[in-house]
A protein has these predicted regions:
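Membrane-helix interface segments
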Residues: 24-26, 55-60, 125-131
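Short helix-capping/hinge motifs at transmembrane helix termini and TM-loop junctions
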Residues: 52-53, 82-83, 147-151
Length: 197
């Protein structure tokens, strides 16, 4: 497992954010919801934006979804090339949710959330939803560190991967609009016909 430059800073930041050993009750429940379940609220928000959106907004959402898949693929590659232990594997700090002992850098949860958050923010007509997604992404990122399954640098890496993935996919927007968006529109129409017939 890799030891990052500035590892002492990474661990110091982690210990400053990580929850105390006696965390319980509502605080623990809130942190677990933030860490593990806001991703489902984001999915519901994206579905709502897709159904209610204009065709150009759905085309952009499709592009962002492709960027998210690319981001998660990059995470797999990064994890293979530069594996880094999770806090409980060191061990350091306190851990409150179970997790497999696998590489921590970057965080898949945070990468997914930040890719959609930046993506939604990037289209002016979806920016208000983007603000909500940014709050969700920030809370999820905090929760992953607070509950002891990620280091702060894992989250920072996720934010960078999210931006890079969006930048890499953006030049392919014309191809996505021409080839993939029509298929997505047919799926969209089929969903509406099925639900509202």
């Amino acid at each position: 497992m890799l030891r990052f430059p500035f590892e002492s800073t990474n661990r110091a930041l982690f210990l400053a954010i990580n929850a105390p050993a006696d965390l319980a009750g509502g605080s623990l429940s809130f942190a677990i919801i933030a860490s593990n379940y806001l991703v489902f609220l984001l999915a519901a928000l994206l579905l709502w934006a897709w159904i209610r959106g204009q065709p150009f907004e759905r085309r952009w959402l499709l592009t962002v979804a492709i960027a998210a898949l690319l981001a998660l693929s990059l995470n797999i590659l990064i994890g293979m090339l530069v594996p880094h232990p999770r806090p409980f594997m060191v061990p350091v700090g306190n851990t409150f949710i179970p997790h497999d002992p696998e590489t921590s850098f970057p965080s898949d949860h945070a990468t997914l959330m930040w890719t959609f958050a930046w993506g939604l923010y990037g289209l002016p007509t979806l920016r208000r939803i983007g603000y909500v997604a940014i709050v969700f992404a920030a809370l999820t990122s905090w929760g992953r560190v607070f509950l002891g399954v990620h280091f702060p640098f894992d989250i920072a890496g996720s934010m960078v991967v999210a931006v890079i993935s969006l930048m890499l996919v953006r030049p392919w927007q014309p191809y996505i609009d021409a080839r993939l968006a029509p298929l997505a529109e047919r799926v969209h129409v089929g969903m509406l016909e099925k639900w509202f017939k």
